[in-house]
């Protein structure tokens, strides 16, 4: 036990030395200890950096820390902010979990492989496990974005059906399906690797997936097919949003199913004739004003909100596309042109492109911060250690009061908190009165404030 503790201590000291020490400092005893440890286990070898400090390794450590921390903030925000409790943000939280696990389990071991010149320094049975985790979390990220794009399109195309079946339970079921597909793609890797080590080792030293058939099939299933679905659904989403916005802008709405266009025109014409006969002296300005009031402002605001959300998700999708496309394209080319391509160049490109893909896991929280006010405020509070959940002010019940409204449209009721007596303001004496019961009102208690309520009399 003492020897194991000393070995672990020596390894950690030496790992820090790999990151910050210069080569002219004498650390040969520590290097010799760690070299002996790995030489006795798996024949690994240590290559000490030459000349200057290993700044690339330090930058990778910073990327790992930012990836883990940023995605933890996303998970906290969706968990604690009630405004973020919807299906899309549940998907984003699950995506953040996958990205956080990339930073915890995949990126550190990849950094370790870089520090040892891509010679696997750990026990050999851990190599297929690490590759499987890499494929699992990367595939999960892609599948989450694909599921989000499909969910957004359905929500915009059929909002009534989507809202009817879009509960928290349904969202969790969809997320479970995404993870099940990702696990199904990654599970064969440890099975293949433990049976035949040549499938996960190159030159018996470098831990990398070395099965051409699995590389081809896995790349298409885990990346290119979901990518095609995302591109199509995102284009359709933009098309539907633009069409709905244009229809509302010109005062048209989509006709309900089962009603013909002639029937709608007839109804509109009859309605217009009745209004003209009932109000022959109504001026043209009043008609225009009514037409503007009938325009569904709430629907237009909802479309604007959907457009903003689609913009943020589109940026996430575009960043993901830019980050992962080089790796998967190079991965396919390395298999298809195995004899004609320069394999050493392909290996170097893959080593660079895979880290560009890893960086994508840390960029998503930055996108949310820049383009979403709720996430930005939540992140700011959490970084200042402010985890308090906003509570609603206490409510107080106002006694039931009967009132007669003399206005055919609205009734203004001023309630003074220090007396609890409603004061009714008559809007007009020219229109017939409508008897109305004012029900119990629950309003926040604030003795120094005066609350003015506008209550519809219909």
UniProtKB/Swiss-Prot annotation:
Keyword terms of this UniProt record: Behavior, Cell membrane, Disulfide bond, G-protein coupled receptor, Glycoprotein, Membrane, Receptor, Signal, Transducer, Transmembrane, Transmembrane helix
Organism of origin: Homo sapiens
Region described as Disordered: spans on this chain: 274-301
Protein name as it appears in the record: 5-hydroxytryptamine receptor 2C
Purpose of the protein: G-protein coupled receptor for 5-hydroxytryptamine (serotonin). Also functions as a receptor for various drugs and psychoactive substances, including ergot alkaloid derivatives, 1-2,5,-dimethoxy-4-iodophenyl-2-aminopropane (DOI) and lysergic acid diethylamide (LSD). Ligand binding causes a conformation change that triggers signaling via guanine nucleotide-binding proteins (G proteins) and modulates the activity of downstream effectors.
Chain location of the short sequence motif PDZ-binding per the record: 456-458
Extracellular side, ranges: 33-55, 112-128, 190-213, 337-347
Cellular component aspect of the GO annotation: dendrite; G protein-coupled serotonin receptor complex; plasma membrane; synapse
Binding locations of ergotamine: 139, 209
Cytoplasmic topology ranges: 81-86, 152-167, 237-311, 371-458
Basic residues: bias regions: 287-297
Residues that carry a glycan: 39, 204
């Amino acid at each position: 036990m003492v020897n194991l503790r000393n070995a672990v201590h020596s390894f950690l000291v030496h790992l820090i030395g790999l990151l910050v020490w210069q080569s002219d400092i004498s650390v040969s005893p520590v290097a010799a200890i760690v070299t002996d440890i790995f030489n006795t286990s798996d024949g690994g070898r240590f290559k000490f950096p030459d000349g200057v400090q290993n700044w690339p390794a330090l930058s990778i450590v910073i990327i790992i820390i930012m990836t883990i921390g940023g995605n933890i903030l996303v998970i906290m925000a969706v968990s604690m902010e009630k405004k973020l409790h919807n299906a899309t943000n549940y998907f984003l939280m699950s995506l953040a979990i996958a990205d956080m696990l990339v930073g915890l389990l995949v990126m550190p071991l990849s950094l370790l492989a870089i520090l040892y010149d891509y010679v696997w320094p750990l026990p050999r049975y851990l190599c297929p496990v690490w590759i499987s985790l890499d494929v699992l979390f990367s595939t999960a990220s892609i599948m989450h974005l694909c599921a989000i794009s499909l969910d957004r399109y359905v929500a915009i195309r059929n909002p009534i059906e989507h809202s009817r079946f879009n509960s928290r339970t349904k969202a969790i079921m969809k997320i479970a399906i995404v993870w099940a597909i990702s696990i199904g793609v990654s599970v064969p890797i440890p099975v293949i690797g433990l049976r035949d080590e040549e499938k996960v080792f190159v030159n018996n030293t470098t831990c990398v997936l070395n099965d051409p058939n699995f590389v081809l099939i896995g790349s298409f299933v885990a990346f290119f097919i979901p990518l095609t679905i995302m591109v199509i659904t995102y284009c359709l989403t933009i098309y539907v949003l633009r069409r709905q916005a244009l229809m509302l802008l010109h005062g048209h709405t989509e006709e309900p199913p089962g009603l013909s266009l002639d029937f709608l025109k007839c109804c509109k014409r009859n309605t217009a004739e009745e209004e003209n006969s009932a109000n022959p002296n109504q001026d043209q300005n009043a008609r225009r004003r009514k037409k503007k009031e009938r325009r569904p402002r709430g629907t237009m605001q909802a479309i604007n909100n959907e457009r903003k959300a689609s913009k943020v998700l589109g940026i996430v999708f575009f960043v993901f596309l830019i980050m992962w496309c080089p790796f998967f394209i190079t991965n396919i080319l390395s298999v298809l042109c195995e004899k004609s391509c320069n394999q050493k160049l392909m290996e170097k490109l893959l080593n660079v492109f895979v880290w560009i893909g890893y960086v994508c896991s840390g960029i998503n929280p930055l996108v949310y911060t820049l383009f979403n006010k709720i996430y930005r405020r939540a992140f700011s509070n959490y970084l200042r250690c402010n985890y308090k959940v906003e509570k609603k002010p206490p409510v107080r019940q106002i006694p039931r009061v009967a009132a007669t409204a003399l206005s055919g449209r609205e009734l203004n009721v001023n309630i003074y908190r220090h007396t609890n007596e409603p004061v009714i303001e008559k809007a007009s004496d020219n229109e017939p009165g409508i008897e109305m019961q004012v029900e119990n009102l629950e309003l926040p208690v604030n003795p120094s404030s005066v609350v003015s309520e506008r209550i519809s009399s219909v």
